[in-house]
Amino acid sequence: MNNIHTPVLATEMLSYLAPVDNETYLDCTFGAGGYSKLILSNCNCKVIAFDRDPAVISIASQFYQQYPNRFTFFNENFVEANKYLSKLDKLNGIVMDLGVSSMQLDEANRGFSFRYDAELDMRMSQKGYKASEFVNEASEHQLADIIYKFGEENKANKIAKHIVLARKKKPITTTLQLANIIREAVGYNNYYKKNKIDSATKTFQAIRIFINDELSAIQNFLNQSLELLAVNGRLIVVSFHALEDAIIKKFMHQNAVKKVAQSKYSTNRQSPLQNGVLYLLTKKIAVPTRTEIINNPRSRSARLRAALKINE
């Protein structure tokens, strides 16, 4: 298990989660096991982990051996957690590390990255609708809508038009084929100078989010999380782009205790609190240090939000 990577914002995650002996924590996005290992190594606690990617089952099996009676794994999307955990004792903490994992990006045959020429797949669960099916079957309007909505790509209409024109000549089946169509549509050098990213990046993000239904899964799970957490349990979420963070921020703020405004003439020196379930531990997002970004460039867009459940 020495090859397990150190996940982003590891120190910050542990600081906000503050795991202790004899408590139980949920790792919603097991991946290569980075967060689970940090938590289990920190104290004599238990971890329940979820991940829909069958490629991580072999890693999870190593945890069963190293942490007997302390680790449980479900090869399921975290949105299914309530189905498996609702009859168990409530959790003392939940951690989520969202988006595509480094392991998935680095496996060329998964089709998440245009750094390799591979089948255009992008399925986290390796089941269901492939990215290649979407780009070859969706209408130009559907393509533009998804690319704009989930990629926040201002040139979505132009990209969609080029995809439709290209697939009439030849089906789009590989990552580099799609990336080059996008680059041809919007240019490469000028786009990079303006945005500091490859011109295919936002479109690949959009298609991946759509194929895996990522944003609705996040929203659905966050709604479950308040039922799963015990009072004094902590919710830690790491996201990598504005669409994810907006959902998390809105959820936490909607469920947070709020100070009630009062007259400046009031003799009450303590601001009373409105009813709420969560206390925000991060008033602003936590972000990686310069050192972490240098050591792991993929961490540069990571942002962490944390909250404490204080009421049922």
UniProtKB/Swiss-Prot annotation:
Identify the EC number(s): 2.1.1.199
Q: Which CDD domains match?
A: AdoMet_MTases (cd02440)
What is this enzyme's catalytic activity, as reactions?
cytidine(1402) in 16S rRNA + S-adenosyl-L-methionine = N(4)-methylcytidine(1402) in 16S rRNA + S-adenosyl-L-homocysteine + H(+)
Task: Describe its function.
Answer: Specifically methylates the N4 position of cytidine in position 1402 (C1402) of 16S rRNA.
MF terms from GO for this chain are: rRNA (cytosine-N4-)-methyltransferase activity
Major localisation: cytoplasm
Please indicate which superkingdom the organism of origin belongs to: Bacteria
Record keywords = Cytoplasm, Methyltransferase, rRNA processing, S-adenosyl-L-methionine, Transferase
List the lineage, top down.
Answer: Bacteria, Pseudomonadati, Pseudomonadota, Alphaproteobacteria, Rickettsiales
Cell location: Cytoplasm
Q: Which family does it belong to?
A: Belongs to the methyltransferase superfamily. RsmH family.
Q: Which NCBIfam families match?
A: 16S rRNA (cytosine(1402)-N(4))-methyltransferase RsmH
What name does this protein carry?
Ribosomal RNA small subunit methyltransferase H
Binding of S-adenosyl-L-methionine occurs at: 33-35, 51, 78, 97, 104
What species is this protein from? Answer: Orientia tsutsugamushi (strain Ikeda) (Rickettsia tsutsugamushi)
Q: Identify the enzyme class.
A: transferase
One GO biological process term: rRNA base methylation
Alphabetized HAMAP family for the sequence: 16SrRNA_methyltr_H
Q: Where is the signal peptide?
A: none
Q: Name one GO cellular component term.
A: cytoplasm
